[in-house]
Amino acid sequence: MFESKINPLWQSFILAVQEEVKPALGCTEPISLALAAAAAAAELDGTVERIDAWVSPNLMKNGMGVTVPGTGMVGLPIAAALGALGGDAKAGLEVLKDASAKAVADAKAMLAAGHVAVMLQEPCNDILFSRAKVYSGDSWACVTIVGDHTNIVRIETNKGVVFTQADNAQEEEKNSPLGVLSHTSLEEILAFVNAVPFDAIRFILDAARLNGALSQEGLRGSWGLHIGSTLAKQCDRGLLAKDLSTAILIRTSAASDARMGGATLPAMSNSGSGNQGITATVPVMVVAEHVGADDERLARALMLSHLSAIYIHHQLPRLSALCAATTAAMGAAAGMAWLIDGRYDTIAMAISSMIGDVSGMICDGASNSCAMKVSTSASAAWKAVLMALDDTAVTGNEGIVAHNVEQSIANLCSLACRSMQQTDKQIIEIMASKAH
C-alpha cells in the first residue's frame, strides 16, 4: 500500500504543509504587527521610545479584540509595543515567545504614556498589511509586511533603505509549493495520504502535540469564554452526554479558548491561523483516540485534514469575511472520515454537507468568541461525517452545493473572493464604530 519513493507531486504536498502548518504564539494578525515592530527595533542601537504603526482594515479587524499572550491585554498597540521591546524578530510567528516580565511591564508603560499609535493604512489594496515605525532618539526604523503574516517586504531606517523585496509575485507563486494546489484535487491528495511513506509525514504529529497541549490548558484554566471547561461541567451535571461528539466539541473548544484567551503556549497554525490549525487537528485527534489509531494512522489522518484545509483555503483570500474555521473543519471532516472508513466518497460527501451547513459564517475579527465558531465548525464536521457514513449528504440540488465536491468548493470560495467583499467592509465599519 505504501510507496518507498516520493514523487514530485507528493514532495510539493509535503512542502505545502510545511509552509502553511507552523507554530504560532498568539493570534497571528497582532503577531504580524509585533514581528514588524521587533524587526524594526532590531535595526536600532538604542531602546525604542515611540511607535507609529499602520495596518490594513482586515488586520485591524482581526487585531482589535484578541488577547496578546502574556499581557492580559487586547489589541494591536500592546502587540506592537511588546514586539519592539521584547520580541525576537528571528522567531517568526513565535516572536513573543521569550518576552520577559520586564518587557511586558515596559510595553504597558509605553502604552500608558501614549507613545504607541496604530492607524489604518489608507488607501490600502493589500488584505494583509502591517507597518511599524519605531523611534529611538533621533533614529528610526520602519518595517513593512505584506501578503503573509511574516513576509517582510521592506526595511528602512533614517540612514536609508536596508532591504526591499522585488515585486515578482508571479514568479514567487510559480516557485511556491502552494502553486501545485491550483491544479490538483482531493482525490490526488487522498492518494498521497494513502501511500506516502510514514517517515516523510511524521512531522505532522507535532500538530497533535502542540494543539493537544493547548486543549489541556483550556480545560484547566478559565481562558477566554472557557467554553470547553464550561461544557465539561455540564457533562458532570448530566446536561450533556459524555460521548464522542461531545469530546470533539469540548476538546476543540478548549484549545481555542486557551489560544484566544492569551495562553503562553504556541498553536500549530494552518494557513496563517492558529484557530484553523486547532480546528484541523483536535477533532481528528479525538476520533483517532476513539478508534485506537497508532501514530502512523494519526499522521495520515492529520496530513489529510491539514492538506485538505490548505487546498480549500488556497482558493480564498488570506483574510476575508468568511470564517475560515469552517474551511479548516472541512479538512477535519476529511481526516475523521478517513479514520473510520477511508473512502473518497465518504470524504467528498462530508465536505459537501459542510458547505451546505456552515458556509455563511462570517469572520467579525479575532476574539474570544472565535472559540464559539471553532466549536460550531468542529461539531458540524462530525455531523457531516456521520451522515456520509450512511451515504447521506447535502446534494447538488440544494443551494450552492454542486454535484461534485470540487465544484462545491469552488462555489463557496467564489463567494468569499467576490460577493463577500462588501460584507467585509460592513463588518469593519461596525467594529470601528464600536471602538469610538
UniProtKB/Swiss-Prot annotation:
GO terms for biological process: L-cysteine catabolic process to pyruvate. The gene is yhaM. Pfam families: SDH_alpha. Belongs to the UPF0597 family. InterPro entries: Ser_deHydtase-like_asu, UPF0597. HAMAP family: UPF0597. This is UPF0597 protein YhaM. GO terms for molecular function: L-cysteine desulfhydrase activity. It comes from the Bacteria. PANTHER family: UPF0597 PROTEIN YHAM.
